[in-house]
């Protein structure tokens, strides 16, 4: 276990008081679950979370100061019960060391040292953290993500009775009645044999309403084509009245608004960090893609339903937001030449498939997304923002969160050059240029 943890966190962590702790000692303490808490001292929501998380952490660890809770009392010094085998590590985005020190001083858990800025950034990219505060739980032995939305764990299971909060099958989480907007109720068993889109959305969210209008047409086309397909609306509306108003526009099913526990479990299952989000599932309930929103917007005629992920994407307005999710390889081409974009996709697809398969075998997300960018206003804006030359073809890796770019300046781009470029990036052998 210590090997994985040291690779992830480095050799040393620090306590709130500034004392160093050897990472390999976590294994000796029987830690089975690791929480990574991403936050910042300047964020009011992070300050609020720290207070509630401290009480939660204390209860699970059996600390008397946390008040009565499972495991507290005389047996607290004994071999830890499974629910107590938890450690949390704070991963900060602070830019001021004094503010960081003031913030971590009262934390009862550990923190990544302030100086480990590069490692912090790698963790943010690895787990696709898009907002703060965020709390994810990992199996401390295998490194697999157990739960992507630990904030809901704290809210829904404050005593830690469901520890270690591992993912449950979709069929189990969705079990119960589902509604149509005419008041008809169906059992979730009616979904058997169907592809399912789990749609997290809300009426108060303008991008949600825009997507819903497109999704209604996509749903109609797919059903008319004879496909077994259903969508389940999981509302984030702020009132039942708003839910009913929004749901009246939808021809599909919904989790009842009053079933807050089931809505929360679905958010937890898929680690929802923002809306709108459309998760596409196969008939067995396994995730096909988390990027259903992008796929629907890019495939107006639904010819590629159920939208299995492509190893290489063509950069567009609808998927450009993915550039902010982590490092992305972008091959810029002259799209005025017919077939140039397709040839570029074929050029980088073998290495993209190899990288994706390697990390899928480890049940991890690939550390890179792969794009081909043609010539349009959006691509021009991207070149301007990243200060890239107008050359084409141009092979780059862009890391927006690190404000860094890597450019391969060669006359001819070959599969071997692409693979070497990617491997050198993953091995941290490339020198970044600032964006």
Swiss-Prot record:
GO annotation, biological process: cell differentiation; circulatory system development; in utero embryonic development; negative regulation of protein ubiquitination; negative regulation of Wnt signaling pathway; Wnt signaling pathway
Disulfide-linked positions: none
Statement: the UniProt record of this protein carries the keyword Isomerase: no
Molecular function GO labels: thioredoxin-disulfide reductase (NADPH) activity
CDD domains referenced in this protein's UniProt entry, alphabetically: PDI_b'_NRX (cd03071), TryX_like_TryX_NRX (cd03009)
EC annotation from Swiss-Prot or TrEMBL: 1.8.1.8
InterPro entries, alphabetized: NRX_PDI_b, Thioredoxin-like_fold, Thioredoxin-like_sf, Thioredoxin_domain, TryX_NRX_thioredoxin_dom
Recorded family membership: Belongs to the nucleoredoxin family.
Disease: Robinow syndrome, autosomal recessive 2: A recessive form of Robinow syndrome, a disease characterized by short-limb dwarfism, costovertebral segmentation defects and abnormalities of the head, face and external genitalia. The clinical signs are generally far more severe in recessive cases, particularly skeletal abnormalities. All patients with the recessive form suffer from vertebral segmentation abnormalities, resulting in scoliosis and chest deformities. Rib fusions are considered to be characteristic of the autosomal recessive form.
The name this protein goes by in its record: Nucleoredoxin
The organism of origin for this protein: Homo sapiens (Human)
Lineage of producing organism: Eukaryota, Metazoa, Chordata, Craniata, Vertebrata
Gene this protein is translated from: NXN
């Amino acid at each position: 276990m210590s090997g994985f943890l040291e690779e992830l966190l480095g050799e040393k962590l620090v306590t709130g008081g500034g004392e160093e702790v050897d990472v390999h000692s976590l294994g000796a303490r029987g830690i089975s679950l690791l929480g990574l808490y991403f936050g910042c001292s300047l964020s009011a929501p992070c300050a609020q979370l720290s207070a509630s998380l401290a009480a939660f952490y204390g209860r699970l660890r059996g600390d008397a100061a946390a008040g009565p809770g499972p495991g507290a009392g005389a047996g607290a010094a004994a071999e830890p019960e499974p629910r107590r085998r938890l450690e949390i590590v704070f991963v900060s985005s602070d830019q001021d060391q004094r503010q960081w020190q003031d913030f971590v001083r009262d934390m009862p858990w550990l923190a990544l040292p302030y100086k480990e800025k590069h490692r912090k950034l790698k963790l943010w990219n690895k787990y696709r953290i898009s907002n703060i505060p965020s709390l994810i739980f990992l199996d401390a032995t295998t490194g697999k993500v157990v739960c992507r939305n630990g904030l809901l764990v704290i809210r829904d299971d404050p005593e830690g009775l469901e520890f270690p909060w591992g993912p449950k099958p979709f069929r189990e989480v969705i079990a119960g009645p589902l509604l149509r907007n005419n008041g008809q109720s169906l059992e979730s068993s009616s979904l058997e044999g169907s592809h399912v889109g789990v749609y997290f959305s809300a009426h108060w969210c303008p991008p949600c309403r825009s997507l819903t209008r497109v999704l209604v047409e996509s749903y109609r086309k797919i059903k008319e084509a004879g496909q077994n397909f259903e969508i389940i609306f999981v509302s984030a509306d702020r009132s039942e009245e708003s839910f009913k108003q929004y749901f009246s526009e939808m021809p599909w099913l919904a989790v009842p608004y009053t079933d807050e526990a089931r809505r929360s479990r679905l958010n937890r299952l898929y680690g929802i960090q923002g809306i709108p989000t459309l998760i596409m599932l196969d008939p067995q309930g396994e995730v096909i893609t988390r990027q259903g929103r992008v796929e629907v917007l890019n495939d107006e005629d639904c010819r590629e339903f159920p939208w299995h992920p492509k190893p290489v994407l063509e950069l567009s307005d609808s998927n450009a937001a993915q550039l902010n999710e982590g490092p992305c390889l972008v091959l810029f081409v002259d799209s005025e030449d017919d077939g140039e974009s397709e040839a570029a996709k074929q050029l980088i697809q073998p290495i993209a498939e190899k990288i994706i398969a390697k990390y899928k075998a480890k049940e991890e997300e690939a550390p890179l997304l792969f794009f081909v960018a043609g010539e349009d206003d959006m691509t021009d804006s991207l070149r301007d923002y990243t200060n890239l030359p107008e050359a084409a073809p141009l092979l780059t890796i862009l890391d927006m969160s690190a404000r860094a770019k890597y450019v391969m300046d060669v006359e001819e781009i070959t599969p071997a050059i692409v693979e070497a470029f990617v491997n050198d990036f993953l091995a941290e052998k490339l020198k970044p240029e600032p964006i």
